[in-house]
Amino acid sequence: MNAITQRDSKSFTGRKRIRKSFARIGDVVPMPNLIDVQRASYEAFLQMNVHPDNRTPTGLQEVFRSVFPIDDFAGRGRLEFVNYELEEPKYDVEECIQRGMTFAAPLKVILRLIVWDVDEDTGSRSIRDIKEQPVYMGDMPLMTDNGTFIINGTERVIVSQMHRSPGVFFDHDKGKTHSSGKFLFAARVIPYRGSWLDFEFDSKDLVYVRIDRRRKLPVTTLLYALEGQRTEAAIASGTDPQDLPEIHGMTAEEILSYFYTQVVFTSTPKGWARPFDPEAFRGITLAEALIDADTGTVVAEAGTKLTARSARKIAEQAKTVLVGRADLLGRYMAEDLVNDQTGEIYAEAGEELTEARLAALETLGVTSLPTLAVDQTTGPWIRNTLAIDKNSTRDDALIDIYRVMRPGEPPTPETAEALFRGLFFDMDRYDLSSVGRVKMNMRLGVDAPDTVRTLRKEDILRTVKILCDLKDGRGAIDDIDNLGNRRVRSVGELMENQYRLGLLRMERAIRERMGSVDIDTVMPHDLINAKPAAAAVREFFGSSQLSQFMDQTNPLSEVTHKRRLSALGPGGLTRERAGFEVRDVHPTHYGRICPIETPEGPNIGLINSLATYAKVNKYGFIETPYRMVEDGKVSDQWRYLSAMEEDRLVVAQADAPRDSTGKLTEELISVRRQGDFRLVKPEDVTSMDVSPKQLVSVAAALIPFLENDDANRALMGSNMQRQAVPLIRADAPLVGTGMEAAVARDSGATIVARRAGVVDQIDGARIVVRASGEDGATQGVDIYRLRKFMRSNQSTCINQRPLVKVGDHVISGDIIADGPSTELGELALGRNVLCAFMPWNGYNFEDSILISERIARDDVFTSIHIEEFEVMARDTKLGQEEITRDIPNVGEEALRNLDEAGIVYIGAEVNPGDILVGKVTPKGESPMTPEEKLLRAIFGEKASDVRDTSLKLPPGTTGTIVDVRVFSRRGVDKDERAMAIERAEIERLAKDRDDERGIQERAFLNRLREKLMGHPASGGFKGIKAGTIITDEVLAEHPRGAWRNISVQDDAVVADIELLKREFDAAVAKIQARFEGKVEKLQRGDELPPGVMKMVKVFVAVKRKLQPGDKMAGRHGNKGVVSRVVPVEDMPFLEDGTPVDLVLNPLGVPSRMNVGQILETHLGWACANLGRQIGELVEDYRRNGQQRDELLSRLREIYGENVYNDVIADMNNDQLIELAENLRKGVPIATPVFDGARPSDIENMLSRAGLDTSGQVVLTDGRTGEPFERKVTVGYIYMLKLHHLVDDKIHARSIGPYSLVTQQPLGGKAQFGGQRFGEMEVWALEAYGAAYTLQEMLTVKSDDVSGRTKVYEAIVRDQDSFEAGIPESFNVLMKELKSLGLNVDLENRSA
């Protein structure tokens, strides 16, 4: 119970604030990195850091291998792929974001062109020439460390797609197709790429096949087209398939022999006899007595019902039994009956035996009749299909298939053969993929290596056989929604498919070009046009449905976005067609996909989130870890299993009771097996969950007391945490779940130390760490640049703050700087606020939230939002636009914030309508009016030929300028402002260079000093005589820079010193080269869109306080809108006079069933009061220094012995005070999902904090001073401010744009639109009888064009009468009617 949740409780931040955990189940399995899904997939695709010779055939390597070699049509040239390499990216991530570039590396592919000499007569070829050359194939986007891509300057995420796994699936129509409600079974073979193959029963119980959902054919047509035994025997004997004169298909006899066993009837003197098969006779009632054919004795009387046992008994007595002629009638022949002498066919395979046919065969003297074993367990489906199939040979079948696939084209045997080969048996056109082959082997019970990726004859036959078995009631259909049948396509695989398409387009062009150029003189790069491949990549990242603008509202939303699984997208489902089953939770989701986190609305269940411990295996199936259990004893061994592997397991819950040795203690254990819950004995359990939170996703695992919330509200809670806006001062939750640190670390919002070392320098914008190696020697310098007030995709503010001080020791993996929404290395989406559950004058009706003025005043929920505005100066036909301060007809007051270049200063406070960047655009020459002529004569030229197109701040935005960036085209002179920005940037780079060089130099000199100490000098250095023993005093007399010139007599030491010098000089040269490269990039000028000469980006920081209309929420789906800000003195207050911060409506709890919020309130109340007690002890300790023991014993009491001994006991005074200060606001606790604090723990904490265990207190009304009638639940609850801010939504319009057709005002804030006055509003005005108001609403205030003008004129003349005309929408209606051929005339009648 006293475990700490953070794995890194001893880490740098973990020691500063310790989270007490209520978990009873420890973490056995480390949680995988949360964004590994993305990173691992793309690394496997690029194999960037793998030597070209060692690359596995996956990803990019596999794409090139599958498309190359490319041969020309004449067979004289071949282009082969050797290998590829990715060079260094041109710009780093930061530069790409600033310049609007794509973070990508140039892809160089080494290609080999082989040219042959072909002998005209013999056709033999000899190699004439081989040319190898690296060819540039476009840029390949790289993934950042955080699993995102920078495309055109914005961060994007490629969402993984869930799709149906390739393989074979059996299903039925659930009785919906046919009116009788009988099940029609179907099988479908789905390849990774290529044609789909469907087998289905129709209502007449015949089996049909469809290729690519085309017209159906009898299945036997497909079987005829497959190779028969004659051809297979010829190939088996070593004949090349190409050399066979003709390929023989399967015959009717072969088809029937595959699907049916035979029953041979023999003629005896006593009549026809058959072998007695107990299976065939089981369960039937005999119509006549059974007589042994050999002895003639009766073995069973007529009317007997044969059971399995009696049938077996009879089988022991009689081998063959006599049957009447009636038993032969209606049976089907299994083989062709042929007269061996004459070759005459008496009966064909599959033919039905009728009375006449049987008599004819008897007269011909046939003594043995092989028939098909069709009985009540095996139906005649294939035989019946054979009977209705009009084809009987392979050629007919192929031509039939050709007609279905290419209707309207005349078939020839050759084209039909080629089409059929290409459909399922050609590697280039049909690919099951290794996954598909593995799935197919498992389902069909065949054993083909996973390199066989096309269909085989055996696969098709087995599929049809299993389909017929299903029809006969053997076996079960597949569950399409089982995660064993759905797989994940991550970034790497999606990218691989896209790149393959690009290369295939390129391949065609290469073939044609090889034919049209002189193959002897060209080089590989002359043949290649990489545009199609580059375009495919660009299109995928830029406009694919799965390439999404990253949700960067806060660190949790980033992590969740990268872990998202979508069933939509290319090759997936569509919202409209997805049924209920696909969206529903499935038993196999356990531990793989979160059952809670999914959007509300049309996408529910189609977009999911990976569970916390889930991983995706190499086949794309989601796996979850299980602990192994042997003989009822739980081991610490664990392994990851997919849904298919889990099918065999008996899995116990993570909280199954066990003793200290790990033995399960209950007599019966609750387990999951094949999707059901059962009770079994401990020795039958095979495995066990690793953690209670493995079932839910990251966002759901952040909700404390999730087990006490209704699922619908938990869904809202996990979704709303992703919308929490980063606050100026965030608090980590008092009541957390222990997942907070993992999310903060893996999200990339914080800065994590790459190597161990000592902090050397620090300021607000960077941290310099002197990295130390294994032996403690300096290994180099790590400079961490902090992101300061940068804009996220959602306009929230990204700002990082250092957590370390100079001299601090950090180890690899420590969090050294907090980012947005993190505090001390833990996720901090909101604030802990004191909250009371009670009604307050109707202000918290219907989920409204009442807040105290303190919250607004103290910036508790204040957030900073950064808006980006950009303006471009283009080269127009009339001349260049210019960015300038000299704008016509604008007063000095409006230009007060602009510098001499016309760009706003950083730090300026700006309001709506203020000019941010002055810009003028040339105006076309138009004839001048006399007034203009006069003005021009007086004021000179400038004013008239340009117009003001400055960038102004849009309405509703007020803020401070935090950053300005100026981009100039190459070759265009930079203005003063651009030069100033460039100088500042170069200074910053130079400072980094100097610091890094300084640290390297210090380390070098220290090691040099160690080498020199105690050795006699060898002379040749001014000021040190030969033979002088070198000591600190000797060195102190000389400047440090000169030490490197001192030489000593010991040759080994001299060699060491020379090596040191070389290493140091190389390191310094590398630092300088890096600096010069960056400066060169800065001064070079920017790549701007065509026609743009200059671009300016202005960033405005807007401070948003909490105000009425803003949306807030807790973590339990308890959301509401702020209704009123109440003065502090009017808020209800506690007995000690503390006013509460928030008042929530208690009626929001019972019907919503999210009781977790109440438990959180109680526990938060206890935490805060414990923190207060610790704060008092710290004060005493500071005053008189005597209270250390009391403080330690208090901490021991709170955290328990284990944590105390592990972490707290060996702290020094400073560390102890820092810890206690961090606990002053409350002792943070972790109550993990499904394994958290019990009610008894909460009561325990409350009593320890000296509070009433009911969690309720007497509150006093702040307005009357009277205590409320009964006690009120008060406590600390974690509240978030959501990204639905009233300032972004409020909007007003007087006049503005109108729609062209209807002439009605546009809608929406972005269009500066009006509010629709809808039909219900019209009814309201009608009900009031407000006729004139109604008339205005429907005419002059909306779409009566002439009326609008008249109103304007009347207002200008200061009159108040006007006339309403005909609304434009009425004219539109008339035009619509006229377009239908109805002539509508308006009659002008006076009233």
Swiss-Prot record:
Gene Ontology molecular function? DNA binding; DNA-directed RNA polymerase activity; ribonucleoside binding
Coiled-coil annotated spans: none
Keyword entries, A-Z: DNA-directed RNA polymerase, Nucleotidyltransferase, Transcription, Transferase
- GO BP terms in the entry: DNA-templated transcription
Q: Which residues form the signal peptide?
A: none
Q: Quote the catalytic activity from the record.
A: RNA(n) + a ribonucleoside 5'-triphosphate = RNA(n+1) + diphosphate
Fetch the Pfam families from UniProt.
RNA_pol_Rpb2_1, RNA_pol_Rpb2_2, RNA_pol_Rpb2_3, RNA_pol_Rpb2_45, RNA_pol_Rpb2_6, RNA_pol_Rpb2_7
Q: Which GO terms describe its cellular component?
A: DNA-directed RNA polymerase complex
NCBIfam families in UniProt: PRK00405.1, rpoB
Q: Which HAMAP family match?
A: RNApol_bact_RpoB
Known role: DNA-dependent RNA polymerase catalyzes the transcription of DNA into RNA using the four ribonucleoside triphosphates as substrates.
Family affiliation: Belongs to the RNA polymerase beta chain family.
Give the protein name, as stated in the record.
DNA-directed RNA polymerase subunit beta
Species of origin: Granulibacter bethesdensis (strain ATCC BAA-1260 / CGDNIH1)
Designated gene of the protein: rpoB
